[in-house]
């Protein structure tokens, strides 16, 4: 850095010498020890002794030396900062050069993976992706909310899925816990929620539907338990709301459990809309491996023919349902049918 300082001074001195030679005056010896004094003297000179004046030859040299010294000092102050900036730029460039770069193959693989994910249809979610609804959630309703009329939702009748509802119901009963005891009507409602042939609903809307189902059951119990309601009318409003909420959450938790179980096994129960459509048309072959064909729609006490071959009914629990209350009664004893001839239901009869 000192070398650059002296080089700059030498250049300035040479320039001053040339200027003095052109004006006809000789440049005096420059001494660092007297720069401050010369500068102070130069500041007191009047305007008539500026450069170009020939009356006072000595003052011109002093003025030029003072200006030159000021320029040199300012340049010397700026040189370290410029050097630091140059070093900083070199460090940044070196750091950028050492930064690891992503390989082109990784970029191509990520891009191809994104394209494949984008091409997949949205309705290919597996059962593992089913989140379900928490069974710890409660529905606290105030008495004012209970006092208003609860309108029933538009629920499809079981006849909508009458071609396959029995087989889906049988499969659903097998995967449910014993205390749930779902009915055919409840199975049809759950099927309607998971039916992908229509616009899929969100989990929040499903939860609202389950809450509505539970409210309908509370109203049904209200009509059945008139004597108990007569006693409840004598109680205060908060107590009545508490009793209603207790019943509501009992029904709601049951619906949530059935909903989660149906959602976990929906591919086995109803499959895709294409499989359901095929099963409604009575196709055979690979579609028989699904749950829709795994449970044949054959009455337990029915007997019929099938090319003269006989078979024995397997042990199955038979459920009876009350059409008015839609509540399953306790299962009856297992029935063992004697050897008899079976008849395939319509749509599954073997060709001659």
Curated annotation (Swiss-Prot):
Domain of life: Eukaryota
Motif mapping: RxLR-dEER: 48-65
Gene field: RXLR122
Biased composition range(s): Low complexity: 280-290
Location of this chain's protein in the cell: Secreted; Host nucleus
Region called Disordered, residue ranges: 280-352
Comp. bias intervals (Polar residues): 302-315
Range of residues in the leader sequence: 1-21
Role description: Secreted effector that acts as an elicitor that induces cell death in host plant cells.
Species this protein is from: Plasmopara viticola (Downy mildew of grapevine)
Free-text comment on this protein's domains from its UniProt entry: The RxLR-dEER motif acts to carry the protein into the host cell cytoplasm through binding to cell surface phosphatidylinositol-3-phosphate.
UniProt similarity note: Belongs to the RxLR effector family.
Protein's recorded name: Secreted RxLR effector protein 122
Keywords, alphabetical: Host nucleus, Secreted, Signal, Virulence
Gene Ontology CC: one annotated term: host cell nucleus
């Amino acid at each position: 850095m000192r070398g650059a300082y002296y080089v700059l001074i030498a250049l300035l001195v040479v320039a001053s010498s040339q200027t003095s030679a052109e004006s006809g005056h000789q440049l005096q010896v420059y001494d660092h020890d007297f720069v401050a004094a010369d500068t102070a003297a130069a500041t007191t000179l009047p305007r008539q002794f500026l450069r170009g004046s020939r009356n006072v030859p000595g003052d011109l040299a002093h003025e030029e030396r003072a200006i030159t010294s000021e320029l040199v000092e300012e340049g010397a102050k700026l040189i370290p900062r410029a050097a630091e900036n140059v070093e900083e730029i070199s460090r940044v460039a070196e750091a950028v050069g050492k930064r690891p770069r992503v390989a082109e193959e990784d970029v191509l693989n990520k891009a191809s993976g994104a394209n494949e994910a984008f091409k997949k249809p949205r309705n290919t979610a597996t059962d593992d992706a089913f989140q379900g609804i928490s069974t710890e959630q409660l529905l606290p309703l105030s008495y004012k909310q209970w006092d208003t009329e609860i309108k029933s939702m538009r629920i499809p009748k079981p006849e909508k899925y009458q071609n396959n509802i029995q087989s889906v119901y049988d499969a659903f009963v097998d995967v449910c816990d014993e205390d749930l005891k779902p009915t055919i009507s409840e199975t049809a409602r759950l099927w309607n929620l998971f039916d992908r042939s229509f616009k899929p609903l969100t989990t929040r809307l499903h939860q609202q539907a389950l809450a509505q189902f539970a409210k309908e059951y509370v109203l049904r119990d209200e009509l059945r338990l008139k004597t108990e309601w007569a006693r409840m009318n004598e109680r205060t409003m908060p107590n009545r709301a508490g009793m209603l909420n207790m019943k509501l959450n009992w029904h709601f938790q049951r619906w949530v459990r059935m909903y989660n179980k149906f959602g976990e096994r929906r591919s086995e129960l109803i499959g895709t809309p294409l499989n359901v459509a095929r099963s409604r048309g009575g196709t055979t072959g690979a579609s028989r491996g699904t749950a829709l064909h795994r449970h044949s729609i054959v009455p337990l006490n029915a007997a019929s023919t099938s090319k003269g071959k006989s078979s024995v009914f397997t042990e199955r629990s038979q459920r009876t349902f009350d059409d008015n209350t839609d509540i399953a009664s306790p299962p009856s004893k297992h029935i063992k049918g004697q050897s008899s001839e079976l008849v395939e239901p319509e749509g599954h009869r073997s060709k001659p």
